[in-house]
Amino acid sequence: MNIIGPDKIVFGVDDVATCQQFVIDYGLVQQDDYNYVALDGTGIEIRQIDDPSLPAALPTSTMLRKTIYGVADQATVDAIYAELSKDREVKTLEDGSIETVDDLGFAIGFQITIRKELDLPAEMVNAPGAKQKRAVNDIGVSKDFTPKPRSLSHVVYFVPDAVKAEKFYAERLGFVTTDRFTNTGPF
């Protein structure tokens, strides 16, 4: 399946104003009353914890309500629908995206990605084995620099059954584990 990555993470929170200020300070751009985006259009949605438009809360203290993954095309949305509807309800929403829950109860959605292609220079960093790009102790950015996150690149779930979660995402959706936290779970 051609899943590109998370397009949006949706939260239900106790203190909307503080959370909004945090993400603005982080560098996300306010798109509307609820949505805050990175340069490529991916981002987060912040709503009041009891907002009726949100998926049901998990029986934990997590504020995460839904992860919406961007996919390459409608054929991928259709393939995910066909695969996941074998053993669970999958809803098609008004915008053509689909919504369901994973094996641990997290609400997940899939849509044709909203990511915009970026054409930006790489950041000036020195890395082991690479040609030096800037002098030692030179600041890598201007002191007047305002951070602007480029993309929402990943989401981390801390779950009670990492093996079950990994199995769902790998076997049902084709995710590939690239790294692991010892005794915690996969990436």
What is each stretch, according to the model?
Residues 1-17, 66-67, 123-163:
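N-terminal beta-strand motif that seeds the catalytic metal site of vicinal oxygen chelate
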Residues 1-50, 99-102, 157-187:
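Core segments of cupin and vicinal oxygen chelate
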Residues 4-10, 23-30, 59-60, 114-118, ...:
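A broad, low-specificity signal for short, low-complexity segments enriched in glycine/proline
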Residues 5-13, 42-45, 55-148, 151-160, ...:
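Vicinal oxygen chelate
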Residues 21, 56, 77-79, 120, ...:
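Short acidic, gly/pro-rich beta-turn/loop elements at beta-sheet edges
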Residues 21-26, 80-86:
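Short amphipathic alpha-helices in soluble, non-transmembrane regions
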Residues 30-72, 96-99, 111-113:
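Conserved donor-binding loop and adjoining core beta-sheet/short helix segment
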